[in-house]
Regions:
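Non-catalytic structural scaffold of enzyme domains
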Residues: 2-285
Length: 285
């Protein structure tokens, strides 16, 4: 099968047809959402997957809530018009905290969001100190503070918001080395603590991609917790019980919002995850 880059107007050679499978969209502002997709694919390998990333507005962490809601709804709408969806996963903590109500109101298929894994982290911590590593947007939003009040009110929560770590994760996917010195600088507030967090919530879907490097920088024995496996289980349940019969026999496909050199350079990465085709998605608005 040939590798394919499409600008949204050029027809491409489809992969060898297969049996129709439920179509699931995984969406993120960048390509960090592949960490969630990988967990879902591990549990549910026989689905028709679409991965969409918004390389025009990336990163979302610094955008307004109104902008994010409008943008995410427009992108999911554009995908749904191309491929009827059985389910959509918003594999972006920032987008999930603000856009899920609008998505669920507009669409009949289930929409799964990603929220920081504060509840399991509160159960796992031994010293009662939990770190939340996320974008600044996620750290600031009331939804995050409500999760903490509900599930971790007996824990000491230390929050760090970083847009730079998102960029480091994207760079790693492009094949660049991750600077441990940069991570140490970002994590300095924790590393200087007399008793730092023993459990760290990776509150951005980009951050599991940096797990290896984080474990080299954080104190030995630190647990890293993310939502990927829980999202996969939730996806499986919803597909069985609530999803519409929306299937496709097409090959998995990835969509970007602009066919830039940076997007084109991601094709080998996307191919490793099972997406042979990268195409520009036309989005209104």
């Amino acid at each position: 099968m040939a590798t394919k880059l499409q600008d949204g107007n050029t027809p491409c050679l489809a992969a060898t047809p297969s049996e129709p499978r439920p179509t699931v969209l995984v969406f993120d502002s960048g390509v960090g959402g592949v960490s969630v997709y990988d967990e879902i694919r591990h549990l549910l390998p026989d689905l028709h997957y679409i991965y969409a990333f918004d390389n025009v507005a990336f990163p979302y962490g610094e955008k307004s809530e109104a902008f994010i809601v409008e943008r995410v709804v427009a992108i999911v709408t554009a995908v749904q018009e191309r491929y009827p969806l059985a389910l959509a996963v918003v594999a972006c903590n920032t987008a999930s905290t603000v856009s899920l109500p609008a998505l669920r109101e507009k669409f009949d298929f289930p929409v799964v969001g990603v929220v920081p894994a504060i509840k399991p982290a509160a159960r796992l911590t031994a010293n009662g100190i939990v770190g939340l590593l996320a974008t600044r947007g996620t750290v600031k939003r009331s939804y995050t503070h409500e999760l903490i009040a509900r599930f971790a009110n007996e824990c000491q929560i230390e929050m760090l918001g970083s847009a730079e770590m998102v960029e480091l994760a994207e760079a790693k996917l492009h094949g660049e080395d991750v600077s441990l010195d940069a991570l140490k600088r970002i994590l300095r507030p924790w590393l200087r603590m007399k008793e730092p967090p023993d459990t760290v919530v990776l509150g951005c879907t980009h951050f599991p991609l940096l797990q290896e490097e984080l474990l080299q920088v954080l104190p030995e024995g630190t647990r890293l917790v993310d939502s990927g496996a829980a999202i996969a289980r939730r996806t499986a349940w919803l597909l069985e019980h609530e999803a519409p019969d929306a299937k496709s026999a097409d090959a998995n496909i990835a969509f970007c919002m602009a066919m830039t050199p940076g997007a084109e350079q991601l094709l080998p990465v996307l191919q490793r995850y099972g997406f042979e085709t990268l195409e520009k998605l036309a989005v209104l608005g």
